[in-house]
Design a protein with these regions (language model features):
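Alpha-helical recognition segments enriched in aromatics with Gly/Pro capping
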Residues: 1-93, 106-107, 165, 186
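Small-residue-rich helix-loop
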Residues: 98-186
Length: 186
């Protein structure tokens, strides 16, 4: 059986094209998108599930094969929305087991954190709910190796009547309260 699918558009008037810099599968993978998220999103471009699956968006490849029905193919062109793909990717990242996420996140963590004493699995546990793409990871953890140099002007505010000496006293007073909070790992 031959089926014609509507084109995937970059915007309302232009088809996606590698000539115009639109991303390929390999480009999306390099940008930190998971294969499962890409497949799920692309499957829903120009097709929508029917019946009791009509409101559902997230499918495994096996589930897509089971629920696919040719009647769900749209005649209208579909517009590729990178924000929607990013949303799908974030859903897939958050749905992963902590162990699986740590395994795929470690190369991105090690890209920014060279200190071998830093536990990549512990860092991954903190990042899983905060990342939309794997390539977000290095910029979120680069401070582990080198803290930025903050000047004393950060502690000066005329409106709040603070200066470095007052700020130091306030921070010293806050230490006992913060120490009483216990676990800081989350």
């Amino acid at each position: 059986t031959y089926v014609h699918c509507s084109p995937v558009m970059r915007d309302q008037h232009n088809k996606m094209s590698k000539r115009h810099g639109d991303p390929s599968y390999e480009d999306l993978k390099a940008q930190g998108y998971l294969t499962e998220a890409i497949l799920n999103y692309v499957a829903l471009l120009g097709w929508s599930p029917r019946g009791d699956q009509a409101e559902r968006e997230v499918f495994s490849l096996q589930e897509l094969a089971e629920v696919f029905d040719i009647a769900g193919i749209s005649k209208s062109p579909a517009i590729f929305d990178i924000e929607k793909l990013t949303h799908f990717n974030a859903l897939y990242l958050r749905a992963m087991s902590p162990e699986d996420f740590a395994k795929i996140a470690e190369p991105y963590i090690r890209e920014a954190v060279k200190n071998p004493a830093v536990d990549a699995a512990a860092v991954a546990a903190l990042l899983q709910a905060r990342c939309e793409k794997l390539t977000d990871i290095p910029e979120k953890v680069d401070f582990f190796d080198a803290l930025p140099d903050y000047g004393t002007d950060l502690f000066t505010n005329k409106k709040s009547k603070t200066n470095p000496e007052v700020s130091k006293a306030m921070l010293e007073a806050a230490i006992p309260a913060l120490e009483g909070l216990g676990d800081w790992s989350q």
